[in-house]
Amino acid sequence: GGHLMKVSKEAMKDMYLRMVHIREFESKAQSLFADGKIPGFVHLYLGEEAVATGVCACLRDDDYITSTHRGHGHIVAKGGDLKFMMAELFGKATGYCKGKGGSMHIADRDKGILGANGIVGAGHNIAVGAGLSASYRGTDQVCVCFFGDASTNQGTFHESLNMAAIW
């Protein structure tokens, strides 16, 4: 049999609340986009809340993540601010990227969120670079690269695996 990780009730409650926050944020974004109130595009993370929450629950604040065009859930799970995120979706200067990044380009380096990316497969090499940086600096930080299956046929996926394997 496998080994089960013991998770405290407090940690389980925190993970549950993060999943709820992701679902509520995405549901609100979906509604506002459908009503034509959010400009541009919105790619949702509905139904995948547990993935980002479980992964990010194992990370420290100084660990890194890279994300995809469906990155809202990753940002929330890593501790992103919902108000800054929604402001970014609306193109407001109070958003994470001063309203210039929109839904697919949210970043918060202070929280280790190296950015979501609208280009399929563009986060792989950024994640490897963050991992290599941690290694060179002698820290025990990690970088998690969230990606979808469509990105595995991109050159950056294979190049990043190769780079990670050889250093």
Regions found by a protein language model. Name each.
Residues 1-4:
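Short, Lys/Arg-enriched N-terminal segments with co-localized hydrophobic residues
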Residues 27-30, 37-167:
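Cofactor-binding active-site loop characterized by glycine-rich and histidine/acidic residues
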